[in-house]
Amino acid sequence: MSRSLLILDRDGVINLDSDDYIKTLDEWIPIPSSIEAIARLSQAGWTVAVATNQSGIARGYYDLAVLEAMHARLRELVAEQGGEVGLIVYCPHGPDDGCDCRKPKPGMLRQIGEHYGVDLSGIWFVGDSIGDLEAARAVDCQPVLVKTGKGVRTLGKPLPEGTLIFDDLAAVASALLQ
């Protein structure tokens, strides 16, 4: 199972990101080819889980019902392509709330590992920010940076040692399915 578990950040990896937050279902727009990439991985036997910071809830920009609608849309679009999305975990807290789940802390990644009963060592965690990559390193996941979302900006910062870099999630899927 561990070799076939992939963990993804959401905003900037699966869907377009915004510095103003994704606040409505209409603003949740998949990155071209990301839905197909998840479906391809799922069809090949991969479990694709999601770990996403959603501080917009703590900030009052949207509520849990809106977040759940976005995740239902994600699951629906992937299912239409013949795939499945695994566990989706989110941190609803703000940056100053002192929780253990908000990336770069690795709480959400640990939760996914516990859910699937796997050691996270070597599991790929795909993100577009330094926080994603640092969370990956904290639990010995393989940090993977995509150039979508904030990825190009992130390239200008010091990356954790051994970070793999891909153009987008479709390129990650192609590499894993070779």
UniProtKB/Swiss-Prot annotation:
Q: Copy the pathway line from the protein's UniProt record.
A: Nucleotide-sugar biosynthesis; ADP-L-glycero-beta-D-manno-heptose biosynthesis; ADP-L-glycero-beta-D-manno-heptose from D-glycero-beta-D-manno-heptose 7-phosphate: step 2/4; Bacterial outer membrane biogenesis; LPS core biosynthesis
Protein family according to the UniProt entry: Belongs to the GmhB family.
Per the record's keyword annotation, is Hydrolase included, yes or no? yes
Q: What is this protein called?
A: D-glycero-beta-D-manno-heptose-1,7-bisphosphate 7-phosphatase
Q: Which residues are involved in binding Mg(2+)?
A: 9, 11, 128
- Where mainly found? cytoplasm
Q: Name one GO cellular component term.
A: cytoplasm
Q: Its GO biological process terms?
A: ADP-L-glycero-beta-D-manno-heptose biosynthetic process; lipopolysaccharide core region biosynthetic process
Provide the reaction this enzyme catalyses.
Answer: D-glycero-beta-D-manno-heptose 1,7-bisphosphate + H2O = D-glycero-beta-D-manno-heptose 1-phosphate + phosphate
A family per Pfam:
Hydrolase_like
Q: Quick one: which residues bind Zn(2+)?
A: 91, 93, 99, 101
- Keywords for this protein: Carbohydrate metabolism, Cytoplasm, Hydrolase, Lipopolysaccharide biosynthesis, Magnesium, Metal-binding, Zinc
NCBIfam families noted in UniProt: HAD-SF-IIIA, Histidinol-ppas, PRK08942.1
GO MF, one annotated term: magnesium ion binding
Q: Which positions does the site annotation Stabilizes the phosphoryl group cover?
A: 52, 103
Active-site residue numbers:
9, 11
Residues that bind substrate: 9-11, 17-21, 52-55, 102-103
Q: Which CDD domains match?
A: HAD_HisB-N
